[in-house]
Amino acid sequence: MGAKRVTVRGARTSPIHRMSSLTPLLLMGMLTSGLAESPVPTSAPRGFWALSENLTAVEGTTVKLWCGVRAPGSVVQWAKDGLLLGPNPKMPGFPRYSLEGDRAKGEFHLLIEACDLSDDAEYECQVGRSELGPELVSPKVILSILVSPKVLLLTPEAGSTVTWVAGQEYVVTCVSGDAKPAPDITFIQSGRTILDVSSNVNEGSEEKLCITEAEARVIPQSSDNGQLLVCEGSNPALDTPIKASFTMNILFPPGPPVIDWPGLNEGHVRAGENLELPCTARGGNPPATLQWLKNGKPVSTAWGTEHAQAVAHSVLVMTVRPEDHGARLSCQSYNSVSAGTQERSITLQVTFPPSAITILGSVSQSENKNVTLCCLTKSSRPRVLLRWWLGGRQLLPTDETVMDGLHGGHISMSNLTFLVRREDNGLPLTCEAFSDAFSKETFKKSLTLNVKYPAQKLWIEGPPEGQYIRTGTRVRLVCLAIGGNPDPSLIWFKDSRPVSEPRQPQEPRRVQLGSVEKSGSTFSRELVLIIGPPDNRAKFSCKAGQLSASTQLVVQFPPTNLTILANSSALRPGDALNLTCVSISSNPPVNLSWDKEGERLEDVAAKPQSAPFKGSAASRSVFLRVSSRDHGQRVTCRAHSEALRETVSSFYRFNVLYPPEFLGEQVRAVTVVEQGQVLLPVSVSANPAPEAFNWTFRGYRLSPAGGPRHRILSGGALQLWNVTRADDGFYQLHCQNSEGTAEALLKLDVHYAPTIRALRDPTEVNVGGSVDIVCTVDANPILPEMFSWERLGEEEEDLNLDDMEKVSKGSTGRLRIRQAKLSQAGAYQCIVDNGVAPAARGLVRLVVRFAPQVDQPTPLTKVAAAGDSTSSATLHCRARGVPNIDFTWTKNGVPLDLQDPRYTEHRYHQGVVHSSLLTIANVSAAQDYALFKCTATNALGSDHTNIQLVSISRPDPPLGLKVVSISPHSVGLEWKPGFDGGLPQRFQIRYEALETPGFLHVDVLPTQATTFTLTGLKPSTRYRIWLLASNALGDSGLTDKGIQVSVTTPGPDQAPEDTDHQLPTELPPGPPRLPLLPVLFAVGGLLLLSNASCVGGLLWRRRLRRLAEEISEKTEAGSEDRIRNEYEESQWTGDRDTRSSTVSTAEVDPNYYSMRDFSPQLPPTLEEVLYHQGAEGEDMAFPGHLHDEVERAYGPPGAWGPLYDEVRMDPYDLRWPEVQCEDPRGIYDQVAADMDAVEASSLPFELRGHLV
């Protein structure tokens, strides 16, 4: 909120008189609006025409104190409590103070922004002595700052809810924050101002500030519940008072409870009704707690509250019972501040009928006899009357009696005696209770009269006697009787014993005894039988009282039991056995016979025996001699009945004791794959079962309890897991039981994946020689076609093995190579697959030894260096060959003395690539500008290349400028850079249209590009195009052969010749606006040449000297950085050195190709690797690609990298792991010096020893 500005002015002029009368009103307006303007006195002191009077301002407003000086040229400043504020309008040290007004008019008003309590002081306007007047000091002006209270601290805490009890006295305190003047504090309770307030004014936290502490005494009433108690603070600095308040929660007791009885007769209710009594209590904070009591005991403590209306509800729900008669129901209400409980009660008057009627005495009696009965009711209110009914006829009671009952009720009793007759049988006998109080209800008790008399006739219905019934037939016998009460019981008997159903559920349900059924006056009971042998000739009878009837059944049944008896229980091979078959009982008699496994046996008859169930018995015997093959076989006895056409059989199983015998299906050989599991099965027969199975392998017994890799199963089989090839062999099994022993021999054939045991790596051969790559494996099984060979490489066309012979015999495979060629060198993989995964893979390198081949892309190579004896030059000679190569150097045909300190040679070996770097220090034009020859030699021959060391010069013209694409408006160009003279070079294209005079020039960007698309051409126009190379020493000239080309653009309708080239383009400058522009350029050039001819020589010599000095300084101080840049440029097209370069001459053209942009696809050389790693701790540097090779006809660049890749093979597993199949170009990126801590088996091939 921005500060408010107050302006105070005053002078002894007419405006001052007009304002003075309004001063009180202005002051009031300023205090209420936040603006403070100093009143101006009616008369100003001498020397002043306007001064402020005392002023009061609110904190945070802007105040202006007026000071009008009659001598404008004087130095005027203000003083605050005697402290001079200075004449500077900005008043350093007082950022809120400043002087305002027109000094020429003598206005020096003090403006105070955002005033605070520190500005409450006395101020003087002081005028310094000047030519126009003496020193002057104004009267003191007092500035009073009003500070409003920022906060009120209320106790209890503001914003909270305070709980009080109505009628009690409480103290509330309110403390204001710092203010000036002291604020006034007022308390407001529920909208009413509290008068009983005491206040104290105390010093504030700072000087001139005050705080007010007020205390009020409050006696709350119930009407204050939910209202606010507010503390208001005010002082002149506030537009509106500040407030703090809390909410009063007043506790007071509720009103009395009220019960709302449903109906007019309070307390009268009938038993069985669901009574709902609501009880309500109004008012109270907290709302009332309600509970119901019955005869002084709580029955319900559940209630609900409507807080908005402060009403508590509780409903008593009960089912009225007779015992509730006279009960007192009470509803009580109270809360936490109640002095006691308030209660409302109701007494119940319960009406209830008799809960039951009982008839005492027996209603069963023989005909023509008296029956005496008594009818008795339960207690009722009011009493009831009784009457008797027999069917629809009322009977008169003998006497009636009334007695007192429970719960204030009465008991009624009536006695009755009458004579029973046969026709009264089955009639209902009823005792009825009635009363006027229960007019709509009837209460009665009924019994059925039972008059007893006997049955008249009894008989049985079923199969006729003497009829044959087959066993298992379902027979139904029915016993019938007429008349009788009670109903005849109809009891069945079998041979004088009562018939009953089986009691056990598991017994076969052969007898089903029905219940007595009644149809009119006829009674029946059914007996269903599943006929069996025990029913043969049995007598079945039915009885009802003194009456009885019977019948007899004849049953046909096969042998009830066929038993085989043996003369011996323990049999051994060769023992004699006598078996007897006995048929216990059958009807009619049966024929017996014997057979063994379907073969009929001769038998003899035995002595007959008596038979149960009134049937016939039979027996026959057979004689046998047993063997071990009979064990478990059966001999069967068959009993056949012709009449029944049924045969009953029984068998005897041989139990022959004999020692173990191995069966014919016993397996003798088992095959398993290594690391798998196998089961050696056992097929043995023995009785008793073998007591032990003992396995031995190679003379060692296997533990019967099992081991880490074997377990003997309960059947004797041997289970092996994690089988290894060491488990291959014969296993002997020894079986034993109590009768003897037996042995068997089983062979385990373990198949395992092949493992390469011998693979000569590397395998060496001279070019044109013959060699066998031999691969020897350990495998099982050995298969004729398990060997295969692969050649590893990047070019698919170089990987076929059609020119090689594959031979295998047993565990050895051979790849036979005849007339070896260089192209056959490289990595070969022997793959062995015998059907057990995984296949074995072994990597072997074929090293084809050949004579040195020096990389010499052109007949002559040039290296540029300054010949001022301050710079150095490096000659790079690289050759390929196996075995190792030795280098020699000559200069102009004379062997170079490498003992000369100016010559330093470094040699590096990377696979088949060998390098020699010759560094010449302090190059001298007289001594070192010569033709150097590098010769590479090994045991198979030698080769050489020539390198010419020349001076730094202008670049050679580019070569091979040709058109690669053409369109109506553009021409695509391509060329080869020439020798750059040892300095960075750039290219410029000059072209002209033959029909239009004048030339146009275009700079090629980027500067290293060797392709460019010239655009902005006209269709159907012939152009002549030149290519120019330049460096810091000049350009290559335009008159040399092969740097210009003529071309005619096609018409707009013709298709472009080649659209496949995507070359960098740059729009050439547009055609000159004036045709004479080329002429003007030519004239200007002549004028410049005439002026420059005088100083050309001097500048040329100074430039050469400067270049030489720079080369010398950078050679001595930063040779390593310079050489690294050259290496990085060659390898990654980085920054280039400007003082040395390597170029090679063209084969036909005498011009030179620049080697800076030539990057053959070869693996990094060993010296390049050592350049980054350092060599033997020597602090030196050498160039990377100072002399780069150009592709030769014998193979593409990079083809040498993977030919001699290292093979890393585990001594125990010669298979080539997939994780070791790395990029072959990175195998030789280390040197032996850096590998002292590496195991010998992990060294690259060429570092394990020489090939010769």
Curated annotation (Swiss-Prot):
Induction remarks: Following injection with puromycin which induces nephrosis, down-regulated by 40% 3 days post-injection and by 80% at day 10. Also down-regulated by HgCl2 with rapid decrease at day 3.
Transmembrane segments: 1079-1099
GO molecular function, one term: protein domain specific binding
Disulfide bridges in this chain: C67-C125, C174-C231, C279-C331, C375-C431, C479-C542, C581-C637, C775-C830, C877-C934
Pfam families: C2-set_2, fn3, I-set, Ig_3
Residues annotated as domain Ig-like C2-type: 39-144, 149-247, 256-347, 354-448, 454-554, 558-649, 754-846, 852-953
Domain of life of the native organism: Eukaryota
Keywords: Cell adhesion, Cell membrane, Developmental protein, Disulfide bond, Glycoprotein, Immunoglobulin domain, Membrane, Myogenesis, Phosphoprotein, Repeat, Signal, Transmembrane, Transmembrane helix
Signal peptide feature range: 1-35
Cytoplasmic side: 1100-1252
Residues annotated with Phosphoserine modification: S446, S1112, S1119
BP terms from Gene Ontology: cell adhesion; cell-cell adhesion; gene expression; glomerular filtration; JNK cascade; MAPK cascade; myoblast fusion; positive regulation of actin filament polymerization
InterPro entries: CD80_C2-set (IPR013162), Cell_adhesion_signaling (IPR051275), FN3_dom (IPR003961), FN3_sf (IPR036116), Ig-like_dom (IPR007110), Ig-like_dom_sf (IPR036179), Ig-like_fold (IPR013783), Ig_I-set (IPR013098)
UniProt keyword Coiled coil present: no
Residues with PTM Phosphotyrosine: Y1204
Sequence ranges on the Extracellular membrane side: 36-1078
Domain Fibronectin type-III: 957-1052
Residues recorded with modification Phosphothreonine: T1115
GO annotations of cellular component type: basement membrane; cell periphery; cell projection; cell-cell junction; focal adhesion; plasma membrane; protein-containing complex; slit diaphragm
Glycosylation sites: N54, N370, N561, N578, N591, N722
Post-translational modification: Phosphorylated at Tyr-1204 by FYN, leading to the recruitment and activation of phospholipase C-gamma-1/PLCG1. Tyrosine phosphorylation is reduced by high glucose levels. Dephosphorylated by tensin TNS2 which leads to reduced binding of NPHN1 to PIK3R1.
Entry keyword annotation includes Membrane: yes
Membrane topology: Single-pass type I membrane protein
Family membership noted in the UniProt record: Belongs to the immunoglobulin superfamily.
Functional summary from the UniProt entry: Seems to play a role in the development or function of the kidney glomerular filtration barrier. Regulates glomerular vascular permeability. May anchor the podocyte slit diaphragm to the actin cytoskeleton. Plays a role in skeletal muscle formation through regulation of myoblast fusion.
Name recorded for this polypeptide: Nephrin
The species this protein was found in: Rattus norvegicus
Species classification: Eukaryota, Metazoa, Chordata, Craniata, Vertebrata
